[in-house]
Amino acid sequence: MSAADIPGFLFFDHVAVAVRQGDLEPQVNAYKLLGFTEVHREDVLGKDQVREVLLQIGAGPNLLQLLEPLNADSPVAKQIEKSGGRGGFAHIALRVADIQKAFDYMKEQGFKLLDPAPRKGSRGTTVFFVHPKTTEQVAFGYLIEVVQEG
């Protein structure tokens, strides 16, 4: 297989951190003291049930996503519970040019996809998630989000 056969993964889109309910604003303020700027805020409903804040530092796509669960049914709330209630690293996100091609390619390669098809994400994106223990040959050990802008 050549590089031309692999759908274009462009760059890291963001790193996500799960924060406990009530900790979002103190963390946003702390990152602002370090020079980060808030560039997006949204309550993401549906499957995700989180409050999202995107922070940027410097120029370019240097984004940190803070995720606060809106309720106990949120996947982020369950992730925080599994970590002993501490919160912390949630996932990395990779930007692609064509989400459907990336989805089809990863499915063909045997990756365990957590979504049956690409779906609407926050800020007008289309996304799907890849399981941390995805194939017999590959176990990332952490969740991966694949993102297409607009």
Spans of features found by a protein language model:
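Short glycine/proline-centered loop/turn elements that form peptide/ligand docking sites
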Residues: 25-26, 43-49
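N-terminal beta-strand motif that seeds the catalytic metal site of vicinal oxygen chelate
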Residues: 1-28, 87-94, 147-150
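An N-terminus-focused feature that recognizes amino-terminal "leader" regions
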Residues: 14, 33, 49-52
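Short, conserved turn/kink motifs that form compact alpha/beta structural patches or helix kinks used as
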Residues: 67-69
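Vicinal oxygen chelate
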Residues: 2-8, 21-34, 38, 43, 53-55, 63-65, 71-133, ...
